[in-house]
Amino acid sequence: MATSVIKSWADAEDEIPAAEVINNPDGTKTVINYRMNANGQKIRHIQKIREVKVKEKVHPLIAMRKNWSKYGKEKDMPAGPDARTTQLGEVVELKLGTSWKEIEKEEEEQKAEQTQQIVSNQRIKCRTCGGNHFTSKCPFKDTLISDSANTSAAATPEPDTDASGKYVPPSLRKGAGAVRDMSGRDRDDSTTLKISQLNTFVDEDMLRNELLKRFHPLQRVTIVRNRETGESRGFAYVSFVTERQAEEALNTLNGKGYHSLILHLEWPKKRKAN
């Protein structure tokens, strides 16, 4: 609150009263300070303070060292470290004893158990997509085989003629039937999307709970991984409940940024016209 206007700063130093400390019945203290603002007005500042004492139990030798008197350049300085001359480090717990070999042995056994558990979890691995299932039951074997066949065909095109020089139609060339399903019919992927340009640390849970959270429920989320290392190859296949839901995800997320990369969503293979 403003009480008066002072024209001279020299007069202000004389007219500003000292701080007042009032002890309240409830154990708190009321501190009243006065200061000058930019307009030369005297401002009264009231604070209510409650002092809390925290008791810390330490070893008697530690308490004794804290009472040692300082010497040298720190002579007559108050107790406690001075930030100008003392640099505080991290607290390190030192455990002394003769059983350190046993502790190291236990840690090695725990690491061996964790490694064995990881190996057992990765024992069943699909040779097509690297997932945790048998190769014969891979839900995306037809799509991946189709992608591999298209890539191989683009790199090494099949000749139009055989050894005798006769024309061979594409349907009768070598490997023409490799993209068909073993049952003789094509798989229905009308609700499946292929998500490319994913960061390598993105897993199935991140796709479900972060990227595709608004499009739940999801039938299946599979990240294609390297067969040898188990590392993500940068793309995944997601099966939605309805085709409309998949199309909405395609229009919403295609071209959007996700973990420093631009996503590319597409249908896994060319769909038949309605």
Swiss-Prot record:
Q: What residues does the RRM domain cover?
A: 191-270
- Phosphoserine PTM sites in chain numbering: 146, 164, 171
Question: Where in the cell does this protein reside?
Answer: Cytoplasm
Q: Which PROSITE patterns match?
A: RRM
GO CC annotation: eukaryotic 43S preinitiation complex; eukaryotic 48S preinitiation complex; eukaryotic translation initiation factor 3 complex, eIF3e; eukaryotic translation initiation factor 3 complex, eIF3m; multi-eIF complex
Keywords, A to Z, come to: Cytoplasm, Initiation factor, Phosphoprotein, Protein biosynthesis, RNA-binding
- Signal sequence region: none
According to its UniProt record, what is one Pfam family this protein matches? eIF3g
Entry-linked InterPro entries: eIF3_g, eIF3g_N, eIF3G_RRM, Nucleotide-bd_a/b_plait_sf, RBD_domain_sf, RRM_dom
The answer to keyword Protein biosynthesis applying to this record is yes
Query: What are the boundaries of the region Disordered?
Result: 149-170
Q: Which GO terms describe its molecular function?
A: RNA binding; translation initiation factor activity
GO process terms (BP):
formation of cytoplasmic translation initiation complex; translation reinitiation; translational termination
Top-rank lineage group of the source organism: Eukaryota
Family as reported in the entry's similarity comment: Belongs to the eIF-3 subunit G family.
Q: Which HAMAP family match?
A: eIF3g (MF_03006)
Subunit details = Component of the eukaryotic translation initiation factor 3 (eIF-3) complex.
Please give the function described in this protein's UniProt entry. RNA-binding component of the eukaryotic translation initiation factor 3 (eIF-3) complex, which is involved in protein synthesis of a specialized repertoire of mRNAs and, together with other initiation factors, stimulates binding of mRNA and methionyl-tRNAi to the 40S ribosome. The eIF-3 complex specifically targets and initiates translation of a subset of mRNAs involved in cell proliferation. This subunit can bind 18S rRNA.
Mind telling me what this protein is named? Eukaryotic translation initiation factor 3 subunit G
What is the species of this protein? Meyerozyma guilliermondii (strain ATCC 6260 / CBS 566 / DSM 6381 / JCM 1539 / NBRC 10279 / NRRL Y-324)
